[in-house]
Each structure stands twice: as structure tokens, then as C-alpha cells.
Amino acid sequence: MTEGVLINENEVESKLEAVIKPGSFTGENAGEMAEVILIPKKAIDIKLEADVITPDSFAGKSAEEIGKLSVWQGPKTYPLSEFFEVTGNGGSSAAETLIRIKGDAMRIKRIGESMSAGKIEIEGSAGMHVGTGMKGGELVVYGDADSWAGMEMTGGLLHIKGNAGDHVGCAYRGKWHGMKGGRIVIEGSARHQLGGGMDGGEILVEGDVKSFCGIRQNGGLIFVKGSALRGVGAEMAGGTIVIGGKIERFSPGFEFVSMENSITSGEVELIGEFKKFTGDYAISKRAKGALYVVADTNPEL
């Protein structure tokens, strides 16, 4: 699912078209960017905590200074250069800094945490908490992303070209409010509790999701082009969920409202034949969540 294009599923049961506008999630374009390249030196056994890998941290620093930034491995800190060959200097600002990780980063956590501008490209998979707390900029993962991707992000674009784990765009453990802004695009599938506690922003999934997509959702849009297992919108109080495929087990707290032929939410416009439900009334009779399902793929609802 790419931005600014039309998705047409007329060759399958579900007839659904989606126009996704690029939006302004990444902030102003800084033009030509200074590029910092990180090349892994060795296989990583114990996972790294590398929240310093952001355009904000690299901006204004030379390659040597970037290499001296500290990362955690277990109870110890090491310089970034212990694990990466660093080439290139940061730009004069975060918006003018591009970080390119040339290799797999599945055992590196917290890449892009709280970044406000600029761009990160990971030429492989990414570890847990990638893009957590993003405020702006663009982060592209060319492989898969582990769990907690985009947790509590407020802005920016997180683009995962592979699959994603559990708790994408969700709230931190013990908190009730997850993602508040920005956009997450997943070209593959995602696992459990996508958008848990989501307050705003957009999550767009090309493939399928597992259980409890949109659990405790309060706002924002979740659009899943594929199917969902069960518990969609459980404890939902607000926001919008659209499922293009089949929901295997429908949540009992939702009531049918009407048939709709288009849905518009922010920069996303969906065209098709939808059944609209509201809920989750199993939790509160004042709930205002909207759940849309494509009629052709859910004839029994």
C-alpha cells in the first residue's frame, strides 16, 4: 500500500478502492540531506538499546563524534563504533540528516526513538520499539519490524515494507493512550493488538492482522486491507476501523447502523460497499467507535 495511489481489489471477493494521499506527516522537505552510513561490524548476540540512532542525535556531529555516542548492551554501555562502521557527517539540523543502516538491525532496539525530523532507512529488518515516540520525519524499514513499532508516536511516517510484530502504534505497558498522530504503513501483515489505545493518526496495513486490532481505541484510523482474526475494536470508545477482508470472530458489543459506499478520514478515502457498526457497547453505552467491514467478504454480519 503506497501513498498517493489507488488500491483496487476487483479480482478478489472484496471490491474496495482506497486513495491514500501523501499528507504532511514528515514535515518540511529539507532538500539535499547529509548522509550518515552505519555498517554492522559483527553479529550482535545480546540486543542493543540504540535510541541514539536518530537524525536529532547525529545532526551537527562528525562521523568520529557519532561513533562515540553510547549504546546499551545489557548492563554496560559501549560506543556506537563498537558495533558499526560509521561514515559521513550529520547535517546541520535533524531535517538535513539521513541515516542509512546497511544491514539487518533486528537485534537493535529503539532506532528512531523520539526523532523529530530527517530520515532513517534500514536496509533490513528492525528490532523492537523502532520509531517509538516519533514526532516527525520519515523512517523506512525495508524488512520486517519487531513488536512495539511506532509506540506512542505523535507525528512522522513509519513505513514498514515487510511484516510487523505485536502492539504496533500502541500504548506503553500500564498506560491507556497510544499513538496520537502520524502515519504507520505496513506493506505486509501485523500480529496482535495493532493500535492498542490509539488516540489519533493513521495505521494502514496491506495484509492481515491477528487478534484485538484496535483494542481500547479512542481516535484515529486503522485500515486493514486484509482479514482479521477476532476481537476487532474490543473496548473501543472512538475512532475508526475499516477491515477489507473477513473478520473470523466478530465482537459482540457492536451494533449495525447502516450501509455506506464511501469513508473519508483525514488523508484517506475508501470507496466500496461497507457495513457500518458502532460500539463497543459491551463496555459503555456512550461508546462512539465506528467499525466498517466490506459487505462482500462478511455476508453473515
Curated annotation (Swiss-Prot):
The family database entries (InterPro entries) matched by this protein are listed as: Formylmethanofuran_DH_suC, Glu_synth_asu_C, Glu_synth_asu_C_sf
Write down a Pfam family by its short name: GXGXG
What parts of the sequence cross the membrane? none
Tell me the segments the record calls region 7 X 13 AA repeats of [GW]-X-X-[MQ]-X-X-G-X-[IL]-X-[IV]-X-G.
112-245
The record ties this protein, via SUPFAM superfamilies, to: Alpha subunit of glutamate synthase, C-terminal domain
Which Gene3D superfamilies would you find in this protein's record? Glutamate synthase, alpha subunit, C-terminal domain (2.160.20.60)
- What is reported on the regulation of this protein's activity? Inactivated by cyanide.
What biological-process GO terms show up in the record? methanogenesis, from carbon dioxide
- What GO molecular function annotations does the UniProt record carry, in alphabetical order? formylmethanofuran dehydrogenase activity; transition metal ion binding
- Lineage, top-rank taxon, reads Archaea
Among its keywords, does the record have Chloroplast? Answer: no
**sequence repeat segments:** 112-124, 131-143, 150-162, 176-188, 195-207, 214-226, 233-245
Q: What does this protein do?
A: Catalyzes the reversible oxidation of CO(2) and methanofuran (MFR) to N-formylmethanofuran (CHO-MFR). Can use N-furfurylformamide, formamide, N-methylformamide, and formate as substrates. This enzyme is oxygen-labile.
Subunit-structure text: This enzyme is composed of six subunits; FmdA (65 kDa), FmdB (50 kDa), FmdC (34 kDa), FmdD (17 kDa), FmdE (23 kDa) and FmdF (37 kDa).
| Family membership | Belongs to the FwdC/FmdC family.
Q: What is this protein called?
A: Molybdenum-containing formylmethanofuran dehydrogenase 1 subunit C
From what organism does this protein derive? Methanosarcina barkeri (strain Fusaro / DSM 804)
Q: Which gene encodes it?
A: fmdC
